[in-house]
């Protein structure tokens, strides 16, 4: 009985506790349901994200990088434009005027396909009033320069061993004549004219702006030059293609003297060092200004091309100083070296220096146009440099760079220059009628041409299709 009483009392107390514990919960829920909905923004106290620094990349996703449209730039160069008197006379027309468009008629497709076309103007153009002359002291007609412009060349190299053939006055005339063609850059020489920014400067420009000439060393070296003038004091021009800056430099080993002429400093770009006391040229030592120019070009340009007039005439092999200078120039920052002067082709070589720099070197392209006798002087080369541009920058495309073998077709009776042809267009019949067969030049045949091509250009030998096919695909 007592147990039953306690059990009943426990059940009663449990029931009362349940009612008191549960009711407030249900009452609060009901009050919440009956309360109006709050529409104001939550305060900082109720919003734990308020005032929190959230990384921007979480809030705003980075836009996707736009794809870079890769493209190619093509640079071509031919060798010595050397107008002997036979060529000068061949350009005389029936009415007595002169025209030299025929010099380039067979390579116009390649000039057109190139973004930058370069020619080495071996014989100076010192002014028609001086009269015309061939070897040993050349002076070529101004109409030859007109033909260069009409053909579409962009850059004319003027630093050669014949540049000083007509003295300083002839050199200045040679340089200045091309100012009538603003699309052409001249590199290798300088004049006293106030030259514009498309070429290098020497002369009165500096006297007017800074009160000192580049010839007045070391005072000129101590100047604090503006950046564009640092470029303009050097021996290079800059050609820009689709935003890519390409520097072109040109120097000559000498002007056919063993000493450097008085008064010539600053007017003709010198490749070799000379003793300031005796002015004797040291042909085995590079002019340190050349390396300084290349280093500056490397800083301000994407691609650096150096065109030295160097080496020994009629040698198929580069001499010791060519090999030494080439490595020094590549060490300084040259991407490409394209040489001239020997009048015959020398090998193409890819050079890697001890410091890891590398560059493509054409030791000599040989002649382009001339009246020389030996058969090997008529085997020539056209450099074709392909530059690939991607989002990481510009670099030489070795797979699509090389040399197109050319042949100057001379006939005899009297001597007549028919033109300069790609070797693949030069036929056995043309070889049989080549002037070297009749004037003691050793004769000409296709086997000989192919042998030279294999030995000198080798893996870098190109065909017309290699060049024109690739160039036609470039946007």
Feature annotation, model-predicted:
Residues 30-36:
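Juxtamembrane extracytosolic/periplasmic "stalk" immediately C-terminal to the first targeting helix
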């Amino acid at each position: 009985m007592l147990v039953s009483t306690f059990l009943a009392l426990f059940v009663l107390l449990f029931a009362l506790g349940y009612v008191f514990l549960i009711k407030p919960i249900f009452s609060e829920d009901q009050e919440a349901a009956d309360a109006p909905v709050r529409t104001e923004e939550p305060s900082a106290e109720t919003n734990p994200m308020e005032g929190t620094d959230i990384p921007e990349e979480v809030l705003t996703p980075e836009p996707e990088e736009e794809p870079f449209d890769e493209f190619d730039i093509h640079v071509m160069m031919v060798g010595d434009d050397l107008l002997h008197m036979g060529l000068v006379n061949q350009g005389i027309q029936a009415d007595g005027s002169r025209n030299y468009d025929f010099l380039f008629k067979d390579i116009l497709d390649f000039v057109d396909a190139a973004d930058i076309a370069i020619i080495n103007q071996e014989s100076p153009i010192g002014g028609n009033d001086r009269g015309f002359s061939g070897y040993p002291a050349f002076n070529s007609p101004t109409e030859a320069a007109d033909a260069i412009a009409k053909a579409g060349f962009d850059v004319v190299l003027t630093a050669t061993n014949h540049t000083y053939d007509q003295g300083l006055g002839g050199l200045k005339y040679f340089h200045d004549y091309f100012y009538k063609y603003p699309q052409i850059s001249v590199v290798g020489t300088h004049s006293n004219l106030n030259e514009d920014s498309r070429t290098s400067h020497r002369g009165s420009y500096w006297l007017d702006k800074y009160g000192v000439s580049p010839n007045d060393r070391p005072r000129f070296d101590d100047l604090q030059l503006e950046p564009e003038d640092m470029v303009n004091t050097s021996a290079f021009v800059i050609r820009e293609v689709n935003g890519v800056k390409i520097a072109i430099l040109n120097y000559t080993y000498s002007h056919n003297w063993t000493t450097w002429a008085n008064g010539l400093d600053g007017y003709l770009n010198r490749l070799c060092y000379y003793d300031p006391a005796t002015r004797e040229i040291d042909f085995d030592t590079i002019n340190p200004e050349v390396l300084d120019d290349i280093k500056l070009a490397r800083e301000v340009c994407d691609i650096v091309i150096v065109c030295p007039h160097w080496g020994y005439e009629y040698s198929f092999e580069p001499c010791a100083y060519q090999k030494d200078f080439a490595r020094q120039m590549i060490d300084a920052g040259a991407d490409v070296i394209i040489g001239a002067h020997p009048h015959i082709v020398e090998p193409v070589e890819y050079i890697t220096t001890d410091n890891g720099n590398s560059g493509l070197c054409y030791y000599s392209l040989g002649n382009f146009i001339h009246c020389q006798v030996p058969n090997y002087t008529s085997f020539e080369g056209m450099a074709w440099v392909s530059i690939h541009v991607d989002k990481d920058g510009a670099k030489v495309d070795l797979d699509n760079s090389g040399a197109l073998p050319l042949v100057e077709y001379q006939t005899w009776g009297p001597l007549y220059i028919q033109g300069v042809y790609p070797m693949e267009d030069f036929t056995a019949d043309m070889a049989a009628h080549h002037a070297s067969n009749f004037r003691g030049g050793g004769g000409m045949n296709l086997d000989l041409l192919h042998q030279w091509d294999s030995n000198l250009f080798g893996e870098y030998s190109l065909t017309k299709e290699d060049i024109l096919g690739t160039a036609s695909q470039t946007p």
